[in-house]
Each structure stands twice: as C-alpha cells, then as structure tokens.
C-alpha cells in the first residue's frame, strides 16, 4: 500500500511540474496558460484524493471535489473571456492585447 501511495504522489508531482513548466514556457498563448493552470489544479486534486484514500479521510475527498468545481468554473469563465478576446483582437496571443 505504501508503494502505491508513493507512486501516486510521484505521478501527481510530475503532473504538477508539467503544468508549472507549461505555464512558464507558454507565456504568449492565453489558451495554453488556461490549460496549464487546469493541469496544476488537477494534479493538486489528484494528490489530495490519493491522500484521502490512504488516510481514509472523507473530508479531504470533499475538499478535492470543491477544488474541481472551482477549476471548472474558472475554466468556463476563462474560455468565455478568451472567445471575446479572440473576437475583438483576432488572436489569442497576449502580444495582441498590447495594440
């Protein structure tokens, strides 16, 4: 059981680092920034769920669902703003906002 939780933590950490790295590398494309933020939130939620299963804690699992609900609403608002930005500027690049 301990080996499985360590493997799950490693997977969650790798996903988190991929999300942070994507956020650092893709600073020009707004859509890729939103995807990177979502990946980091999903990685954090994955780690919390694995901890909740290991510790048999239902409150942590509920907290993880709360994080996922907030991430979904954040993505919906971000994508709607991205659609408006694309309509007005014709591009989803951050450099287009400086015109």
UniProtKB/Swiss-Prot annotation:
InterPro entries: NADH_UbQ_OxRdtase_chain4L/K, NUOK/Mnh_C1-like. The keyword Ligase does not apply. Its EC number is 7.1.1.2. It is a multi-pass membrane protein. GO terms for biological process: ATP synthesis coupled electron transport. It catalyses: a ubiquinone + NADH + 5 H(+)(in) = a ubiquinol + NAD(+) + 4 H(+)(out). The chain crosses the membrane at residues 5-25, 30-50, 65-85. Keywords: Electron transport, Membrane, Mitochondrion, NAD, Respiratory chain, Translocase, Transmembrane, Transmembrane helix, Transport, Ubiquinone. GO terms for molecular function: NADH dehydrogenase (ubiquinone) activity. It is found in: Mitochondrion membrane. GO terms for cellular component: mitochondrial membrane; NADH dehydrogenase complex. Core subunit of the mitochondrial membrane respiratory chain NADH dehydrogenase (Complex I) that is believed to belong to the minimal assembly required for catalysis. Complex I functions in the transfer of electrons from NADH to the respiratory chain. The immediate electron acceptor for the enzyme is believed to be ubiquinone. Belongs to the complex I subunit 4L family. This is NADH-ubiquinone oxidoreductase chain 4L. It comes from Allomyces macrogynus. The lineage of its organism: Eukaryota, Fungi, Fungi incertae sedis, Blastocladiomycota, Blastocladiomycetes.
